[in-house]
Amino acid sequence: MSGLFHHRTKPREIRAFVMATRLTKKQLAQAIQNTLPNPPRRKRRAKRRAAQVPKPTQAGVSMAPIAQGTMVKLRPPMLRSSMDVTILSHCELSTELAVTVTIVVTSELVMPFTVGTWLRGVAQNWSKYAWVAIRYTYLPSCPTTTSGAIHMGFQYDMADTLPVSVNQLSNLKGYVTGPVWEGQSGLCFVNNTKCPDTSRAITIALDTNEVSEKRYPFKTATDYATAVGVNANIGNILVPARLVTAMEGGSSKTAVNTGRLYASYTIRLIEPIAAALNL
């Protein structure tokens, strides 16, 4: 029966045939269906596939990453001269940091001999120096499950004693703190790239307006210790500031490595001299 009609059959022809032939309801419906244009085969297949593919489900839980890490790519040092002054810009690793249950306070003299290890070999060929800028940035290398916090601040009076608590350290100029697993957004300061957002960076910069001298003599850590052993106030004419760092709040009595502290700086090197004569 389905072959009696096709889609070009006119409705009045169907009515004439129905009048002459007694059809069942099913046969009549099939005959009418055969007169309708068939939908494209491609669309029919698409509908069947859509009906067979189950709808994806979405979970409503978002987990924070457990592992933390940053890709450090230090650029080569940049050296240039202006008049009688040599200007050097670079970034280098300052120190490795770890955390324990108890608070551990350390300090670093902000002078070429103690900032990293590379600068001292260069700066000893000049008699004096002056910081144009220097910034310390903490980058974590521990999981987000690591307990503890880092605290940093500057002391500009070298005759002052070191703080022994977070409360005392928090009063230092430029004080900054954060959990030991935080600070990735400070990577731009280390890699010397554009900083889109540093709101979560753990970083601190020396205020060069606070230093007591316009320029300082190049001295070793031993030279400094000898001088302040005679008079603590002498330190103010040898070193512009001291960086104080405290690590506390860990979950273990054994030190757990948390990250690294980098120093990025621009320094003016003044009056060249043979290193052997620079005493």
UniProtKB/Swiss-Prot annotation:
Organism, scientific name: Southern cowpea mosaic virus
Region ranges (S domain, virion shell): 84-269
Propeptide: 1-19
Subcellular location: Virion
Disulfide bonds: 188-195
Start-end of Basic residues biased regions: 40-50
GO cellular component: T=3 icosahedral viral capsid
Pfam families associated with the record: Viral_coat
A single MF term (Gene Ontology): calcium ion binding
UniProt superkingdom: Viruses
Protein name: Capsid protein
Subunit structure: The virus particle has a shell of 180 protein subunits arranged with T=3 icosahedral symmetry around a core of RNA. Each icosahedral unit contains three protein subunits.
Modified sites of kind N-acetylalanine: 20
Region annotation (P domain, projecting) ranges: 270-279
Family: Belongs to the icosahedral plant coat protein family.
Disordered: region residues: 31-59
Region (R domain, interaction with RNA): 20-83
Predominant localisation class: virion
Record's keyword terms, sorted: Acetylation, Capsid protein, Disulfide bond, T=3 icosahedral capsid protein, Virion
